[in-house]
Each structure stands twice: as C-alpha cells, then as structure tokens.
Curated annotation (Swiss-Prot):
One of its GO terms (cellular component) is small ribosomal subunit. SUPFAM superfamilies: S13-like H2TH domain. One of its GO terms (biological process) is translation. GO terms for molecular function: rRNA binding; structural constituent of ribosome; tRNA binding. Residues 91-118 are annotated as: Disordered. This is Small ribosomal subunit protein uS13. It holds the Pfam family Ribosomal_S13. It comes from Francisella philomiragia subsp. philomiragia (strain ATCC 25017 / CCUG 19701 / FSC 153 / O#319-036).
Amino acid sequence: MARIAGVNIPVHKHTVIGLTSIYGIGKTRAQQICQSCKVDPTVKIKDLSEEQIETLRTEVAKFTVEGDLRREVSMDIKRLMDLGCFRGRRHRRSLPVRGQRTKTNARTRKGPRKPIKA
C-alpha cells in the first residue's frame, strides 16, 4: 500500500484512479499531477518505484487536500451561517442552497416527511 497525503492508495489500480481516492483530487487534477511528475498514468501503483511515489507525494502536498480541505469547506459554510446571508440561512435550515424547488422535491435535504398534526 502506497501512502500519500495520509491515505492508503489501492495498489492494484492505475495511478490516475488511485490518486482520485484522495479527497480533493479528481481525475483532471490526478492527470495534471502525473504529467508534472512525469509518471505514466496507466501504470499500476504497485509497479511505481519508491522515488516516483515520493515525487507524487511532494506534488500532492502542494494542493489543499483531505483534512485541511474538509476543514476549509466547513469553515466556509460556518462563515456563511454566521453572516446570516441567504445561503447561510438555507444551510442552517437544512434546505437546498442553490435555488432548487422545495414544494415537491428536496426530500434528501429536508429529511423524511413529517405528518401534519391537527
């Protein structure tokens, strides 16, 4: 198991797909990382040399990933709620934030239906 950014990368997968198991790295960024490290994206992670894995580690360390990114996103949401802006109020009430309709849909965000008490 190769360990990059505190995450165990599955060794039986291609380099690009394995890098996407890190929170904050998608396919495009994984391809950019492989290109800048001069690593073939189709090579499986178990076939990489230790120095190639080390270059991947240093390249991934340049980005905000995993715990730091999660903390940053949660702090952004908390800031919106503290400001009391529209988006913050929608987060606080557990409603859709980006203008979706709520009369008939949004069950995932609103939770299960609550019966009306007479």
